[in-house]
Amino acid sequence: MDSNTVSSFQDILMRMSKMQLGASSEDLNGMITQFESLKLYRDSLGEAVMRMGDLHSLQNRNGKWREQLSQKFEEIRWLIEEVRHRLKITENSFEQITFMQALQLLLEVEQEIRTFSFQLI
């Protein structure tokens, strides 16, 4: 995994955790949790690709990995839409920058997961 991606995830999560969005802070905490979950999932897929022999063990261990993959793409799409929505409604420049970086990172991670999944199929 690219060290820039790791630092990007950590930076965005740290920035998001500092935001106070009033009544929507529960939603923000949910976004942070999903970001963390997405990072772990992407990392595990990347590791499976690195050990291509693990493809069969991945499939045997989890016969529903394609279903999980589909679910992760749905989560990514939801996060992208949520981040875009937040970006449109916020007027705070710190939050705008954070959400723009989060959006860029989500698009990069979506592409990485697609690449990993095609290698595993």
Curated annotation (Swiss-Prot):
Kindly state one GO CC term assigned in the UniProt record. virion component
Which segment of this protein is annotated as the motif Nuclear export signal? 12-21, 85-94
* Gene Ontology biological-process annotations: exit of virus from host cell nucleus through nuclear pore
Q: What is its main location?
A: virion
Where is the protein found, in the record's own terms?
Virion; Host nucleus
- UniProt KW keywords: Host nucleus, Host-virus interaction, Transport, Virion
Assembly behavior: Interacts with protein M1. May interact with host nucleoporin RAB/HRB and exportin XPO1/CRM1.
Q: Which HAMAP family match?
A: INFV_NEP
Q: Which family does it belong to?
A: Belongs to the influenza viruses NEP family.
Protein role? Mediates the nuclear export of encapsidated genomic RNAs (ribonucleoproteins, RNPs). Acts as an adapter between viral RNPs complexes and the nuclear export machinery of the cell. Possesses no intrinsic RNA-binding activity, but includes a C-terminal M1-binding domain. This domain is believed to allow recognition of RNPs bound to the protein M1.
Protein name, UniProt field: Nuclear export protein
